[in-house]
């Protein structure tokens, strides 16, 4: 039927890379870059496309066209940056990552529509302890946003972990290889803890907007 299109019966070729840099003159800081590409295996073999992760980041450099049946159109790709900064004396850290699941056309596209196809996570962790032998108190907060922005009205990026051609998405045996809240979702997490020797007592709150992308698709009229 027109409501269901079977997935390809084919294995997937996945390739990714991660670079991490920790500047020696800034204690506790680490910065990184990540990129990943996947496609169906038979398509990769036919086109000898075995190192797609090293191709140009921007779509203006595509050598194979922009149509859905081109080499670039068959790729499901993404990239992002991440960082973490730990303050040992303050017993605190801040971390975050910003990723895109759809390649930008050029630098201008990235600057003018930064929200298109993006997802991010930011978090804070702080430890309070008066003396080395006293009780430890911890506070944690994390915010994850994966819902599409209003730019979807002009060009749809689809939900995270999904792709129009690689319809299996970023999954392994049916499980999403990513955020546990799932595609199109947002969340906030708070936790307060007390550690007394070997005992830990915690209270946590989590708020999840489950698949807001689907809500927008279903009721946008």
Model-predicted segments: where are they?
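Internal, well-ordered domain-core segments that constitute the primary functional module
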Residues: 1-32
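Exposed, low-structure sequence patches enriched in small/polar residues
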Residues: 22-221
